[in-house]
């Protein structure tokens, strides 16, 4: 069932669970656009197939807040905010390892391999490469008996590139826990998050809730 966070006549803010595509799926699996379209069709008085504008994306293994536009004008306005970097995108990630400092800015150049659906860090000036920037802020640490040092980090994207967080953090020696595509510790197998990592993530969620409680309503992407 679609979890709606906010809705008005112009846009819809929803929660995307892990394992669901954020845009229309090429296969038979569930995707958020189809779920949003069904929701609008059921609740709207307008006739015909509802318009759903994709403003930003989240990778399939990632959960988080998604914003969808209900008309082309709103989609254009929101997309412009993304282009002009007026829309903040923040994520919580469990990293394998420990950053050298509590806040670091990483700037790299990424190139996508369309055939393999992967991206990698390449030298500046490489044909087809795009500049990628993010800020990594440490929220907390845990030492797991199996996985070693784990870090809960808040990642703020300054650009939006293919698999950006996963690629950049892995490239800087801090791959995401459980990432079967870019973390060599996992090799593509889905595994249950260790208790220490779950505790880290839960503490991060609680901190975010406390930080926002009592202030103006905010939507963290």
PLM feature spans:
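RNA pseudouridine synthases
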Residues: 1-221
